[in-house]
Amino acid sequence: ESEQLIMTMADMAGISTVPHALIKGNAGLAYITKRVDRNLTDDKIEMLAMEDFCQLDLRLTEDKYRGSYERCAKIIKQYSSRVGIDMAEFYIRLVFCFIVGNSDMHLKNFSLIETAEGSGEYVLSPAYDLLPVNANMPADKEQFALAMNGKKMNIRKGDFLKFADTCGITRQTAEKLIENLVKLTPKWIAMCENSLLPDELKDRLKKIIIERTEVLQ
């Protein structure tokens, strides 16, 4: 339920996400997503190459927490065929994940995907594995899985504005992107209230969203 909620919040924020839903099973609700690297067209299966940032940075899976978001930005600049659009999307995702307490955006939670089979052109894949980690695990005090401006905690608005320079985003544009997300706070709080989460988890998530958006104002 928590992943479905955060993914739906991301949809509301205009973030591209993999198709996702909750389905009823014998043991209760189950969360499902659709693979975006395989497409069935008529009688043919289109197979799109999809590489996560761990692979693109030539790192082993166990090193997925090593690195920085600055390094992620360099990977996008190096491999994306639409750098400007993908950099803005990447930036918005990081601000969003900060707001909802998703502190697990490591190198394997970002990927580039082929635009068409064999095209050799890659773009940032839709978002996946978005979770309110800080609400689910309140003992985890880190706000990010990778460093931004050399730190994973005590992130402030100034850190995002500085990071915008790395992404090739002007300060004015960064301010607007942040403002657009902060404006969604009342809707996100309402979504928490109406969600299937336990009340205690709802309260923790709402508190995180309110505190983080205040930091960004």
Language model feature labels by segment:
Residues 52-75, 112-172:
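Catalytic-core segments of enzymes that bind and process phosphorylated/nucleotide-bearing substrates
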Residues 25-30, 109-115, 181:
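A glycine-rich phosphate-binding loop feature that marks nucleotide/adenosyl-phosphate handling sites
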Residues 26, 175-187, 195:
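Small/polar glycine-rich anion-binding or flexible loop at a beta-alpha turn
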Residues 1-64:
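Conserved ATP-binding subdomain of kinase catalytic cores across diverse folds
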Residues 30-35, 186-192:
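A short beta-strand motif that forms the metal-chelation/ATP-contact edge
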Residues 1-13, 63, 67-135:
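Conserved kinase catalytic-core segment
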Residues 14, 171-175, 179-180, 192, ...:
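ATP-dependent kinase catalytic cores of phosphoinositide-metabolizing enzymes
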Residues 78, 118, 122, 166, ...:
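Regulatory N- and C-terminal appendages and interdomain linkers associated
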